[in-house]
């Protein structure tokens, strides 16, 4: 099965925006090459997770090996490495691009180029990939291939003279795509005689076989039974299973330079086989690891606490298992006076956070309280030390710090002209700095803003979608830290600060956010037997407060007429009881209150 020379191997991926038909195209390629029999075919064959099929997005990376007989009569091996299209998963895209020599750029012929497609195309160009433009969905009545070709040439600067018109749904243009892959994408370099180097681009945990590693052999040959050395973690293992993905796993004896496959080596901890690590042989180690991989750094943090304290260990186990499949998920234990024991988790972005939360609840049956997301701030202390703070409650006091810096991102939005004004207003309200605006063909515009990440992670995406009636798309990337007058806003309920509600805000916005927060909590916290004050404060200065009135029992109900002093005595007794209750009573804060921060109307 592996006797195809490197000259006849093609490694490629598909770059596309959500909903532009990437998974359907992958399905058609699998069918056309006979890799998957028609009777076993189901939609979105490579999207394994239920969540992926439901949301119609690709989250985890998949790979498939196809045998294809081209028009020149030669037998070729095509390795398709499927990539996610969402901005949060750009690290997954970057590692699949490193394993390829070419890419199919799939663009919806009725919608045109979207912002996230751009980001991935730039990544592909940086990795010197050969890009083949494919216009999908040409069977739709609204398809305008000429306009879209113009857009690709104008925005990306790609030559589209060889663009392929296709409809994955109808099966049009599939043969042309396969021929183009063979003719235009270069074969992998023939480095079979060099020392083994292979790139890990994905791994997942199998409860029977341990960690299964997906990899691309860059140099040399790997055989079943080899003892391998992982260059970043320094661990060594013996390969007991080696195979290719077509798309189900098929075992083979050896894989050569240019091939894509999987291995099992009784690896127990995912941390030992990190994505992006280089595999080499223990007895003949490569001199240097493969370049171009960076650790995925979380940009957004939040607290996760089990509603039932007994589930803490279950949550720990669930996170450990998820981390196995998700190189970018970070977590550490944390305690909160309001919520008890839980974890502080780091994510790549909001969609990533939602998906992890949904998987914990769905696959592991956990009931969770999630605190509002926050970003990583850089604090310069008086001694000149740099601290990175991902939890507002850990911020040093104003007397111990010189300044606070927050992460900024460059946001690119592509939108129909009609909504430009509304999106500019949204960006200005979120402390955005206008950078650029370009008019594209057919009444579409690109807007470029620099925004604090903290303003983007709450509900910027939802607001952008609602203001543009779903037509705008956005992409963002980190551009560094900048100093701003930021303050820590504490929320106190019944005189006690609630650490999970603390947040870092811009000084100019502090009053409005504090006011809105106090009002929202007043609505959400149920009434108690005693009066509950809610205060928003900066340091010791209270900037907004609300009161939840007490529930009162009518202690005078049994006094008909009679002496006023009797009534006073009963009222004083009640007041004394309330006072005592207030000092020892705890306030029950419902889960909705912790998510209220997300829904404050700031726009």
Swiss-Prot record:
Classification via HAMAP family: GUFP, LepA
Main localization of the protein described in the UniProt heading: membrane
Function recorded in the entry: Required for accurate and efficient protein synthesis under certain stress conditions. May act as a fidelity factor of the translation reaction, by catalyzing a one-codon backward translocation of tRNAs on improperly translocated ribosomes. Back-translocation proceeds from a post-translocation (POST) complex to a pre-translocation (PRE) complex, thus giving elongation factor G a second chance to translocate the tRNAs correctly. Binds to ribosomes in a GTP-dependent manner.
Membrane disposition: Peripheral membrane protein
NCBIfam families: lepA (TIGR01393), small_GTP (TIGR00231)
Listed EC numbers: 3.6.5.n1
Native source organism of the sequence: Nostoc punctiforme (strain ATCC 29133 / PCC 73102)
Domain of life: Bacteria
UniProt gene name: lepA
Subcellular location as annotated: Cell inner membrane
Reactions catalysed according to its record: GTP + H2O = GDP + phosphate + H(+)
The protein's name in its UniProt record: Elongation factor 4
Residues given in the record as GTP binding sites: 19-24, 136-139
